[in-house]
């Protein structure tokens, strides 16, 4: 019952601040940054750090990265258990490829869905907790990288290290169009197979093998 009441309070709070949330999303989306544009990434990262500070009051730690895809980390709450929230601030499309516009209550533009909408959701989750005086009872740690769209080569080790002591990890990708929450995702595994024997054609000369 207590959890249900808290959920209702949080939802009511977010509904009340919907216009501000959309403005924050618009601000972040209009600060475009494809993975390959390091200068643009720096600008959107600066905007992201500013939003986190203004909305949550929390300071960010910005990692150094050789190629400029610097991850941003901040945390909120206390507790023995940690929940890790993962997101990214880079986008696929080159600057200017997609235009920002609204259609009814829908927002369109580069990164609205993938995944600046998720970043804003994470930030406003913390703001709701703080403004409503609700203790999450856990440490909430957030890590947003800038090279996800090309495979997270520079940030994988950082994310894996932060995940080691996490009770759970949640990726801040928005839900599907009907509101369903994604609870699983396909992965990628690479194998190197070394075979010792006698080469032969499996279809035409398999008897020549071993």
Regions found by a protein language model. Name each.
Residues 66, 87-89, 145-147, 172-175, ...:
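Fold-independent oxyanion-binding glycine-rich loops
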Residues 84, 107, 167-171, 190-192:
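Short glycine-aspartate micro-motif
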Residues 32, 85-88, 122, 142, ...:
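Buried hydrophobic positions in well-ordered alpha/beta secondary-structure cores of metabolic enzymes
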Residues 202-210:
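Acidic-enriched catalytic cores of C-N bond-cleaving enzymes acting on peptides and small amides
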Residues 7-112, 131, 136:
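Acidic/His- and Gly-rich active-site-bordering loop/insert found
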Residues 116, 120-186:
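Acidic/histidine-rich catalytic neighborhood of metal-dependent amide-processing enzymes
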Residues 1-5:
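N-terminal amphipathic/basic-hydrophobic helices that include classical n-h-c signal peptides
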Residues 106-121, 201:
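Glycine/serine-rich anion-binding loops at beta->alpha junctions
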């Amino acid at each position: 019952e207590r959890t249900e009441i808290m959920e209702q309070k949080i939802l009511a709070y977010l509904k009340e601040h919907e216009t501000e949330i959309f403005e924050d999303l618009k601000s972040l989306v209009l600060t475009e940054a494809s993975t390959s544009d390091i200068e643009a990434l720096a600008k959107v990262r600066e905007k992201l750090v500013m939003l986190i500070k203004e909305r949550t009051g929390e300071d960010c730690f910005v990692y150094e990265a050789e190629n400029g895809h610097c991850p941003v980390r901040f945390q909120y709450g206390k507790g023995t258990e940690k929940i890790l929230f993962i997101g990214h601030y880079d986008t696929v499309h080159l600057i200017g490829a997609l235009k920002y516009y609204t259609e009814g209550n829908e927002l369109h533009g580069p990164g609205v869905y993938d995944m600046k909408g998720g970043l804003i959701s994470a930030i406003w989750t913390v703001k709701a907790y703080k403004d409503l005086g609700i203790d999450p009872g856990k440490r909430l740690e957030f890590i947003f990288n800038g090279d996800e769209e090309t495979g997270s080569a520079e940030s994988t080790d950082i994310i894996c290290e932060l995940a080691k002591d996490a009770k759970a990890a949640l990726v801040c990708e928005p839900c599907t169009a009907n509101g369903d929450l994604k609870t699983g995702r396909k992965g990628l595994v690479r194998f190197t197979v070394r075979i010792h024997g006698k080469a032969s054609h499996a279809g035409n000369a398999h008897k020549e093998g071993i």
